[in-house]
Amino acid sequence: LMDVDQPELSIVFGRTKRRVDELTRGLKLRGFRAEGIHGDLDQNKRLRVIRDFKNDQIDILVATDVAARGLDISGVTHVYNYDIPQDPESYVHRIGRTGRAGQSGQSITFVAPNEMGYLGIIENLTKKRMKGLKPPTAQEAFQAKKKVALKKIERDFADEAIRSNFDKFKGDAVKLAQEFTP
């Protein structure tokens, strides 16, 4: 989903400290710049992670509700509720982290079949109906990642220092193209 959405700055909420650690580890393994915060972290580590998030050193903050209380971070484009919150007010608090200061934002909540009734309670509280989404296909995720890679190459080649050394990169580019051609 993140491969396709390409969020600029996002917060992923997990219900427990263990879930936050699992999600952070998984996102890092997939190449995302992610860090987690929860109640077991010492204050210095929490402050460092929040500072890094605000300063674009990390793109994804994974957090429990308690650890995220009081955070005021602008520019969050996506909120992912990996675990549905335990109370409807927490949901409102979570989604309020995106789309601030007149900016648009998106909130995505993962819901298990046995949680659908609870989702209805949240919809009644927020007075908004949530629409179901189909997960992106592997092909859609691949195409999105390819698009990002091509944009990075274009951006890099806009740099005169790189462009002037194109001949040095040409052989590597041809080799990569041959190596990864299906």
Model-derived regions, located:
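Conserved helicase RecA-like core
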Residues: 1-182
